[in-house]
Amino acid sequence: MTLRTRFESSDDVGVFSRLTNAYCLVTAGGSQNFYSVFEQELANHIPVVYTSIGGSRVIGRLTCGNRHGLVVPSIATDQELQHLRNSLPDSVKVQRVEERLNALGNCVVCNDHVALIHTDLSRETEEILRDTLQVQTFRTSIAENALVGSYAVVNNKGCMVHPKTPAQDMDEIASLLQVPVVAGTINRGNAAIGSGLVVNDWAAFCGLNTTATEITVVERIFQLRRDLGGDEPNLLQQLRDTLVDELA
């Protein structure tokens, strides 16, 4: 299931939310409609938690996480940290980290097994990510950009990357993540996928400007539709055909 929504006047859904298989964070102090879209779809399965980070509403840019944990930057207050620990499942470890590159959501993209990280993250932060999220970490870039969290989105079934990512790089990313990878856009051609889309293994939320074709690609690569079938090569070919049709 893929749902379109908007935070106030912004289609950057991924800037104002963080979605995993164990919890969903939604920025505090915004539109009730934005929160309600997440709550109606997710509340029967995982907690949907209002929060800020360091008083900021751009929680998607500042955090990274999966079903094992949540990592927040040093600007997160003690009160915010305690609120998160009280609100999230006991199985989710919440960890604050001292890191110069504190927009962790822009610098890290991960599923429940692997994290791709900014090449300049500190070794201490990398170790905390491994421990808190229980993942393997790989330093890499996407389309020659180190902000991997801005230009890729991943769940345990697939990955979408910046539309100008070379095929060789996509093959390497697929090998690291052990999931199929496709290049695509969100919000009617926007290459900053991480800003406009959040996914877990059964749901996705994107901006209102996202086209039907873009949603089709999202639902196929992340395997959100129950009528999907066939093997991985067929899936990737269908995705390429869809993208070619969109560009034609």
Swiss-Prot record:
<dbReference type="GO" id="GO:0042273">
    <property type="term" value="P:ribosomal large subunit biogenesis"/>
</dbReference>
<dbReference type="GO" id="GO:0005730">
    <property type="term" value="C:nucleolus"/>
</dbReference>
<dbReference type="InterPro" id="IPR002769">
    <property type="entry name" value="eIF6"/>
</dbReference>
<comment type="subunit">
    <text>Monomer. Associates with the 60S ribosomal subunit.</text>
</comment>
<comment type="similarity">
    <text>Belongs to the eIF-6 family.</text>
</comment>
<dbReference type="GO" id="GO:0043023">
    <property type="term" value="F:ribosomal large subunit binding"/>
</dbReference>
<dbReference type="Pfam" id="PF01912">
    <property type="entry name" value="eIF-6"/>
</dbReference>
<keyword id="KW-0396">Initiation factor</keyword>
<protein>
    <recommendedName>
        <fullName>Eukaryotic translation initiation factor 6</fullName>
    </recommendedName>
</protein>
<dbReference type="GO" id="GO:0042256">
    <property type="term" value="P:cytosolic ribosome assembly"/>
</dbReference>
<dbReference type="GO" id="GO:0003743">
    <property type="term" value="F:translation initiation factor activity"/>
</dbReference>
<dbReference type="GO" id="GO:0005737">
    <property type="term" value="C:cytoplasm"/>
</dbReference>
<keyword id="KW-0963">Cytoplasm</keyword>
<keyword id="KW-0539">Nucleus</keyword>
<comment type="function">
    <text>Binds to the 60S ribosomal subunit and prevents its association with the 40S ribosomal subunit to form the 80S initiation complex in the cytoplasm. May also be involved in ribosome biogenesis.</text>
</comment>
<keyword id="KW-0690">Ribosome biogenesis</keyword>
<keyword id="KW-0648">Protein biosynthesis</keyword>
